[in-house]
């Protein structure tokens, strides 16, 4: 069964000066739980949602940054859907050729819809989960997530989120059971 974990970014980051994969860059409690519970990345494909980078594959190398998801930014991300590039250009006068849009990223994760996700976990605070839900609706329309996909939301106090994330990862089918 094709599974996708979408995890909110983390304020705690490794301070490496070079770009490193988001999976290594983010160092908050949920990211540490992910690395401990699924060190080989076999339980699910992992993506992240960032106030700066938008929706990306967790293997994407990213630079260190400091940005918070505000209500205003969350509303703009929801309104812009899966076709707006993140990060946004540094100036409105610059061409919109910065970053990548969520639709392109999910297409790559699903082999352009050939292997749509059947199970998804959305993990993060309320604003992040709101944006994630909007993106998933767009991914369904693109054919990259099945309409009947099971969507789990993990949004509690941090200790409970860590337990639920670990349990969701542990519930993955055995490697041989996946198509």
How does the language model describe each region?
Residues 1-179:
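Peripheral peptide segments
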């Amino acid at each position: 069964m094709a599974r996708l974990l979408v995890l909110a970014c983390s304020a705690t980051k490794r301070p490496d000066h070079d770009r490193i994969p988001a999976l290594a860059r983010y160092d908050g409690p949920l990211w540490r739980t992910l690395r401990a519970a699924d060190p080989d990345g076999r339980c699910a494909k992992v993506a992240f949602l960032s106030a700066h980078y938008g929706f990306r594959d967790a293997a994407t190398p990213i630079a260190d940054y400091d940005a918070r998801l505000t209500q205003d930014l969350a509303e703009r991300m929801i309104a812009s859907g899966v076709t707006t590039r993140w990060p946004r250009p540094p100036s409105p006068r610059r061409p919109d050729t910065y970053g990548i849009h969520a639709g392109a990223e999910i297409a790559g994760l699903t082999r352009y819809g050939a292997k749509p996700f059947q199970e998804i976990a959305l993990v993060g605070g309320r604003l992040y989960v709101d944006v994630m839900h909007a993106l998933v609706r767009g991914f369904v329309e693109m054919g990259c997530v099945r309409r009947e996909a099971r969507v789990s939301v993990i949004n509690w106090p941090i200790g409970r989120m860590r337990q639920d994330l670990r349990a969701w990862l542990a519930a993955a089918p055995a490697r041989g059971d996946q198509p």
